[in-house]
């Protein structure tokens, strides 16, 4: 079977880069859609151009809203999506692959392409392990970029090998237009020029992106304040943290997926342990929350009571356990409160289990709900107050680090 020539390998590499360019383009488009501070559907398919996903929660949305999707988040609202750098780099690799495929090029050009092709592959390996170890999901657009990078690296490396083999073949057996021998006199200046072109291609889209970003500073403190600062019954939780530098009040629902993502983001970015955390349970469950006419998260009242039963010292551990096992606990909550209580007792012991049914626990949860009502808290979670200032819902995800950099820079690690 005939092996591909150097030019054919370069063409394959260019095609792989073009596919990566498309995947990176859709990922960047989805990210840029969020800049109006609203929630939008995202693309999540291996087929370029497929319609956006209408699912409320999918792997691509998880990746997009993760701390790993962008750089310079403290400098610009939302930061600069890493897919922009991939978009620029893939553009270069498409162009350079065509440059090799359409003309007679020396071995040094192929060797540069092979070595440079390791850059997107290396970045893909890093992001693959982040997805596996931290996000626990694989975004299809991201996987498309990973595979494109792999094929690009392999094809570029094979093209280098083929160019060296062809350069050493006897005259008459070499395809037309291929150099007959290594061009040792080729100047290293070309390599520096190509390297500069790669760097410029990778950075240029990001520079264009940030130059077009609006100024969000005037918007981040326009979402109201606490009407009632203190809770008269001392019902709120005080969560111990390692290096508290700024007071924050959080309203959380332990079975709320958005609360889980929000909490994990703050922990992953090193923010949570730099906050002096006061927490109120705000379960979106009509069983105890009289502000609702139907339960959005059945069973959340029972789990919220478990968090309260843990007291200040155990509340965080129980809350994070609830976030980790949220799907299972949510299913148990839909079935019966008793099944959910049994699960909690099995994990946290009979003392916590007995506390769930005590009138004092129900009264404390009700006091926290009254505290929320007195402060006109929207019936959605999470809610975050920095001091007495409410952080806008739009600024608790992509814009969180930027908002804290503006309002509480001492919180940033």
Regions inferred by a protein language model and the residue ranges of each:
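Interfacial helix-loop-helix junctions of multi-pass membrane proteins
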Residues: 30-41, 122-150
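N-terminal signal-anchor transmembrane alpha helix
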Residues: 8-35
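Membrane-interfacial, low-structure loops and terminal tails that flank and connect transmembrane helices
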Residues: 1-5, 165-189
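Extracytosolic (periplasmic/ER-lumenal) interhelical loops and adjacent juxtamembrane/interface segments
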Residues: 31-78
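Internal/C-terminal transmembrane anchor helices
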Residues: 179-211
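C-terminal cap of thioredoxin/glutaredoxin-like
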Residues: 188, 192, 196, 245, ...
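Hydrophobic alpha-helical transmembrane segments
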Residues: 80-102, 123
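Structural alpha/beta surface segment adjacent to cysteine/selenocysteine redox centers
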Residues: 19, 249, 254, 260-342, ...
């Amino acid at each position: 079977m005939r092996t591909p020539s150097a030019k054919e390998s370069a063409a394959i590499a260019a095609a792989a880069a073009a596919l990566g360019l498309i995947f990176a383009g859709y990922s960047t488009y989805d990210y840029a859609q969020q800049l109006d501070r609203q929630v939008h559907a995202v693309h999540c398919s291996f087929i370029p151009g497929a319609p956006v996903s209408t699912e409320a929660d999918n792997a691509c949305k998880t990746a997009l809203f993760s701390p790993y999707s962008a750089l310079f988040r403290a400098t610009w609202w939302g930061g600069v999506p890493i897919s922009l750098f991939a978009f620029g780099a893939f553009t270069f690799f498409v162009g350079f692959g065509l440059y090799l495929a359409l003309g007679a090029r020396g071995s040094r050009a192929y060797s540069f392409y092979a070595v440079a092709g390791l850059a997107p592959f290396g970045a893909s390996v890093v992001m693959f392990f982040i997805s596996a170890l931290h996000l626990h999901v694989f975004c299809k657009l991201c996987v498309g970029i990973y595979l494109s990078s792999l094929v690009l690296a392999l094809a570029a490396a094979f093209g280098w090998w083929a160019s060296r083999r062809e350069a050493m073949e006897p005259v008459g057996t070499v395809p037309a237009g291929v150099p007959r021998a290594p061009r040792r006199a080729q100047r290293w200046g070309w390599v520096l020029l190509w390297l500069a072109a790669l760097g410029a291609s990778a950075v240029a889209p990001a520079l264009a992106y940030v130059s077009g970003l609006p100024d969000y500073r005037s918007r981040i403190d326009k979402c109201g304040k606490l009407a009632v600062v203190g809770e008269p019954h001392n019902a709120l939780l005080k969560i111990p943290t390692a290096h508290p530098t700024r007071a924050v009040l959080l309203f959380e629902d332990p079975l709320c997926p958005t609360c889980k993502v929000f909490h994990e983001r703050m922990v992953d970015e090193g923010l949570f342990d730099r906050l002096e955390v006061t927490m109120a349970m705000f379960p979106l469950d009509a069983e105890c929350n009289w502000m609702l006419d139907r339960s959005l998260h059945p069973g959340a009242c029972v789990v919220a009571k478990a968090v309260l039963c843990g007291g200040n010292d155990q509340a965080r551990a129980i809350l994070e356990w609830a976030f980790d096992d949220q799907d299972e606990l949510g299913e148990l909550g839909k079935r019966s409160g008793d099944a959910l209580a049994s699960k909690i007792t099995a994990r946290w012991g009979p003392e916590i289990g007995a506390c769930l049914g005590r009138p004092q626990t129900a009264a404390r949860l009700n006091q926290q709900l009254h505290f929320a009502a007195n402060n006109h808290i929207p019936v959605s979670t999470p809610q975050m107050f920095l001091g007495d200032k409410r952080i806008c819902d739009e600024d608790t995800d992509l814009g969180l680090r930027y908002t804290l950099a503006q309002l509480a820079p001492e919180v940033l690690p």
